[in-house]
């Protein structure tokens, strides 16, 4: 009996040891895999120099993905297909995904223009990839007028069907993708801001390009500083009017609510909520906008911002704009507002309020039949 017990004990010890060994083996595998995974993440991110804050040359550029080709391009501005293909060879390329009625995109343009002026002769090529948000933004003439208005001289391609957008798996306006001179995507940034970081990447990649091509040049290490274009996140978010755009972001304050493709009679309630817009009059609910059909109509919006813009179109009639119930003075008037009114015709962004300082106010728009509004945006 004692022998049997002894044998059983020895057997149990062997089994426990085996289980422990197997557990240790798999734990070791898990740690090895985790270590390898972390190493891959570190390599993908690329090392940094903590002293200077500047990115260090990546040891194996082939681990970065190669940028997709520009596909499905409907038209070209400031270039031709042949010229652009030739220009892209051996260049550091910054792809800027934008659309001309997007205020966030527009606020990025001064930096792109400054970088183009500063680094184009050092090997930087900026390509504006115009991927429209609204149907009217597909019109090449509208994009050409916007490029002229904002003084854009670098190549712009019209990605009207979002084929290049999809090739990059992009989902944002604006979005920047920067490739080295071999075509690898080395940096991405979505939205506004972090301009210093983006410019440091440009400088680093230009220096790497010069070394690789045996060029005796170094990128200017100073940074573009455009304080007037710095973005403040403490403000009312962009507000959409089309029912297709309001999913999960419906800021219509009227109790009548959205009624797709119907003409709805709206009445402004007594209590107004911040960052919500309220309608008065008869408005047609469209997929990307709302259109006034009654003789008179009104939009009231309590907001927090310095600047107020609308993406709108109309028949050329004037809208009247009030700020906190009063006619807008010259101190608060936007670029498109004169004597408290603005003529609305072309599909575009209109700047109606531009105050000296950011604050909380209520803007009122009084409009006439044919006025069509897509978004409120703020700055």
Q: Residue ranges of each PLM-predicted region?
A:
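Short active-site neighborhood of thiol/selenol oxidoreductases, capturing the structured segment around
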Residues: 82-106, 112, 125-127
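Short, solvent-exposed loop/turn and secondary-structure capping segments
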Residues: 81-82, 106-108, 138-140, 167-169, ...
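Non-globular targeting/processing and membrane-anchoring segments
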Residues: 2-76, 81-82, 196-379
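Short, internal strand/loop/helix patches
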Residues: 141-179, 310
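Active-site-proximal beta-strand/loop segments in catalytic clefts of secreted hydrolases
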Residues: 73, 97-99, 129-132, 159-161, ...
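Non-catalytic, surface beta->alpha helical segment in thiol-disulfide oxidoreductase systems
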Residues: 170-210
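Loop/turn elements at helix/coil->beta-strand transitions in domains of secreted/extracellular proteins
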Residues: 89-93, 121-125, 151-155, 173, ...
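Structural microenvironment flanking redox-active thiols in thiol-disulfide oxidoreductases
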Residues: 106-149, 160-165
